[in-house]
C-alpha cells in the first residue's frame, strides 16, 4: 500500500524530469524498509525471545501493527491521490500478464522464496549446533549490507541499468547461497549470510523499479500489490517446503533450497534482459 501511494503521488504530482530519480530513491527506501521487515525483524525477535520471553515479540509486533498501520491509513497523503484521475482510462487487466511484467513478478517471487528457505534452513542448521534460538540473530547479518546497498541504489549511475543491476546482484546472491549450502560452522554461516545480504537490497530495488515502469496505465496499485504479495507468498511457500525437507531429508538438503531460490532470481534476470524492450506504459 505504501509503494502504491508513493508511486501514484510521484506520477501525478512530480515534474516528468524529476520522476525517474525520485522513483529510484523511493524504491530504494521502500526496499530497505522491506529488509527491516524480513531480516531485521527475526533478528529483533531473537533478541527479545532470548532476553525476556517469546510472547514479548508477538505483543510488540501487534502494538506496532495497530499504531503504524492506523497512522498510515489516516495520513494526509492518502487524500492526495483520491479522485485525482477518476476519468483516467485503465488498461485491460490482461496487460498485467505481459511477459515484461510477469518476469519481474517471477523475480520478486524468487526473492520471497529465498527469504523463506534461508531462514528455515538456517534455523535447522542452528538447531544442529544447539543454538536454534539464535537463528534470528544470525539471519539479521544479511540486513547489514542489504539495507545499506538498497538505500545506496539511488546513487548508481544510469549507465548501470536496472536490468543489469538485477542480474549482477542476483549472481552475488546465488554465489552466496551456493556457499551457504556448504557452511560447516556458525561463523562461516554468519560470514556467508552477510555476503548474501549484499545481493538482496539492490535486486529488490531494481525489481520494484522495473515493476513500476512497466505497470499498465491505471494499474500501478494492482502491480505494486502483486509484487508485494509475491514476496510474502514466496516466503510462506519456501518456509513450509524447507521445513518439510529439513525434517524428511536433513539440514544439508534444506540448505540447498536458498541456492535454488536464488537461481530463480538469476534466471528471471536473464529472461528480463532477453525480452524485447518496449516503451514504458506507466
What are these model-derived regions, one by one?
Residues 1-14, 122, 202-215:
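Intracellular juxtamembrane helix-capping segments at the cytosolic ends
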Residues 14-31, 132-136, 217-227:
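Loop-to-transmembrane helix entry/capping segments in MFS-fold secondary transporters
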Residues 49, 148-162, 246:
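Helix-to-loop junctions at the C-terminal end of transmembrane segments
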Residues 50-63, 133, 241-263:
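A membrane-interface helix-boundary motif in multi-pass transporters
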Residues 65-77, 259-282:
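Multi-pass alpha-helical transporter architecture, strongest
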Residues 73, 172-184:
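C-terminal ends and interior cores of transmembrane alpha-helices
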Residues 94-140:
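Helix-loop boundary and gating motifs at the non-cytosolic
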Residues 218-249:
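A late C-terminal transmembrane helix in Major Facilitator Superfamily
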Amino acid at each position: 500500500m505504501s509503494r502504491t501511494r508513493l508511486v501514484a503521488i510521484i506520477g501525478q504530482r512530480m515534474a516528468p524530469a524529476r520522476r525517474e530519480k525520485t522513483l529510484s530513491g523511493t524504491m530504494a527506501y521502500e526496499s530497505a524498509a522491506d529488509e527491516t521487515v524480513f531480516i531485521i525483524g527475526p533478528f529483533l525477535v531473537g533478541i527479545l525471545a532470548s532476553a525476556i520471553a517469546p510472547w514479548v515479540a508477538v505483543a510488540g509486533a501487534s502494538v506496532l501493527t495497530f499504531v503504524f498501520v492506523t497512522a498510515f491509513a489516516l495520513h494526509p497523503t492518502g487524500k492526495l491521490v483520491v479522485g485525482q484521475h477518476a476519468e483516467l482510462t485503465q488498461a485491460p487487466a490482461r496487460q498485467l500478464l505481459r511477459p515484461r511484467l510477469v518476469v519481474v513478478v517471477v523475480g520478486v517471487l524468487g526473492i520471497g522464496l529465498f527469504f523463506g528457505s534461508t531462514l528455515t534452513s538456517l534455523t535447522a542448521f542452528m538447531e544442529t549446533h544447539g543454538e536454534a534460538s539464535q537463528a534470528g540473530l544470525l539471519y539479521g547479518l544479511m540486513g547489514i549490507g542489504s539495507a545499506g546497498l538498497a538505500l545506496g541504489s539511488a546513487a548508481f549511475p544510469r549507465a548501470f541499468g536496472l536490468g543489469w543491476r538485477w542480474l549482477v546482484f542476483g549472481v552475488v546472491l546465488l554465489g552466496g547461497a551456493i556457499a551457504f549450502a556448504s557452511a560447516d560452522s556458525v561463523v562461516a554461516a554468519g560470514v556467508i549470510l552477510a555476503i548474501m545480504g549484499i545481493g538482496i537490497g539492490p535486486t529488490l530495488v531494481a525489481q520494484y523499479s522495473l515493476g513500476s515502469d512497466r505497470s499498465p496505465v491505471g494499474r500501478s496499485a494492482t502491480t505494486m500489490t502483486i509484487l508485494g504479495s509475491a514476496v510474502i507468498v514466496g516466503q510462506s511457500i519456501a518456509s513450509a517446503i524447507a521445513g518439510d525437507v529439513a525434517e524428511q531429508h536433513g539440514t544439508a538438503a534444506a540448505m540447498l533450497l536458498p541456492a535454488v531460490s536464488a537461481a530463480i532470481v538469476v534466471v528471471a534476470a536473464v529472461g528480463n534482459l532477453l525480452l524485447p524492450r518496449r516503451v514504458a506504459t506507466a
